[in-house]
Amino acid sequence: MIHTIPYFDAHCDTIHRCHTAGTPFRDPELRAFYDAAGDLRRSGGHIDLERAGGFSRYAQFFALYQSPRLVPEGSSMPEQGVLLHQRFLREMEENRERILPCRTGAEVDEAVGQGKAAALLSIEGAELLDCDIRRLDTAYDWGVRLLNPVWNYANRLSGSNAQQPEQGLTAYGRDFLQRMEELSIYVDVSHLSDAGFWDVVRLSRRPVVASH
C-alpha cells in the first residue's frame, strides 16, 4: 500500500546538533545552541520525536553534516561522517518504537503503516566523503539516498552559492554526479552555485531535489 504522507521534510541538521552537543565551546552562545539539541526524542531544536508524535504520517530526511570549522583537532571530515552515521544509528535504536530508518519507498510505507516516523539519510556537503567517488558506495550502504555536492564552500566538485558562484561542476564533479545516479542517490542542489545548478539540471537523468 502506498501511503500519502502529509509531513515529509527533506532536510534537517538535527543529527549534527545532537552529535555536537556537549562540545566545550568557548563561545557561550554557541555552546548553548548545541547543548539545547539534547537528543532526537526531546530537543530544543526544530525537530524532536515528542513533537512529531502529533503528526499522523511523517517522513524526515536527516542530514549527515559537519562544518569544517567544528572538526576537532586530529579528526577529519570523513571520520566525522562515520561518527555522525553512528549517532544516527544510535538515535534510531533508542527510539525504535517511534521511528524506523528507511532506504526505499516500500520501507517508508511500512514505517508509516505501523504508525511510526520514517527516517531517511542525506549528506550535506561531499567533504564528509572527502569528495571521493569511491566513498559513494559506502554512503549508499549506510542508506544515504540524497546528497548535496557542496555546502557553503566550493570544493573539487563545484562552486557554491557563497563561494565561487561562477564555478559550475568540474569534470570530476560531473563524474561524481554520474556515479550518484548509478547508485540511485538523488542530487540536492541546495547551496550549489548557479552555474553548478544549471550543470546538474542539464546532466541529470533523474529528478533533482532542492531541499532548502
Label every PLM stretch briefly.
Residues 1-166:
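N-terminal hydrophobic targeting/anchoring segments and the immediately downstream early-domain regions
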Residues 131-141, 145, 162-209:
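Histidine/acidic residue-rich metal-binding segments in metalloenzymes
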Residues 123, 151, 189-191, 212:
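Short, structured patches in soluble enzyme cores that scaffold and shape functional sites
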